Amino acid sequence: MRHFLSVLPLVLLAGCSSFRPDAEHITPVPGDRVLAYQEDQQNGGRLVVNRDMGLMGGGCYVAIEVDRKLAARIGMAEVVSFNVPAGTRVLGLTIDPLDDTLCGMGRLHKEVAVKVAPGSTQYFHIVSENRGGFDIRPDDKPPQP
């Protein structure tokens, strides 16, 4: 029994980290929460972002920015794509500035520089971890429908 009680906190903490949903459980971000970068870009590329599932921040949207401009508000197990000009883009993750509940009062600011080549598609995913909080990372194995 003592061994069980010593392991229980570790199991509970591990349950808070996010996990990748199966492809059939991922849905597109609804159009009313996709705010920018939907027009085709001549000689541009595409950035595709999906968000993992998990308890931490699970009831909140987070904001995705492209070149520090609000581009979408994404929930758990959702995916969104952006058509962006070629060149170096700044892909960011912040609190949702349109949310006036407790979800919008935290602190979150993660950015990654992305070199976009004409015609390219790059994949990223949003994770939430016990120690590091939210992060946006390149995704070399995106879920395939």
Regions inferred by a protein language model and the residue ranges of each:
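Short loop/turn and low-complexity linker motifs enriched in small/turn-promoting residues
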Residues: 16-145
